[in-house]
């Protein structure tokens, strides 16, 4: 198997950290759509949103997804990548989609411990835990609809990588 592997999930679920570790374990390349966007626009996510609005950012996010997709590549996507139908369809058609599922409380702890100042504007203006709960209430169904595999990602990256590899091997064997 050398299809791209797309990691989806909420902000703070570990897509980049887990993605880098998974890419090393599989000897795959690694790409991050947010990083690609920053490098190609020379703006942070917050700056893109301020300048172009959320619709402009979402369009650029779709462009990034298509640009980084390549065989034998792990792709960490932005948390809102699943909001556009075409992105969900593209990922499912071109690779294996893994939803890194993490409870709201764990996401809140991670985001409070490692704030991404200037990286990602608040979506609702609410406190972190409340915002995450609101966002997941909308997006969880989209993550699940898009994913080939749902992985419990509340543990250390090495444990999560092991779970993903197990899921990929089981799927490949069947």
Curated annotation (Swiss-Prot):
Substrate binds at residues 34, 58, 79, 139. Keywords: Amino-acid biosynthesis, Aromatic amino acid biosynthesis, ATP-binding, Cytoplasm, Kinase, Magnesium, Metal-binding, Nucleotide-binding, Transferase. Its EC number is 2.7.1.71. Pathway: Metabolic intermediate biosynthesis; chorismate biosynthesis; chorismate from D-erythrose 4-phosphate and phosphoenolpyruvate: step 5/7. NCBIfam families: PRK03731.1 (NF002988). The LID domain closes over the active site upon ATP binding. This is Shikimate kinase 2. It comes from Cronobacter sakazakii (strain ATCC BAA-894). The gene is aroL.
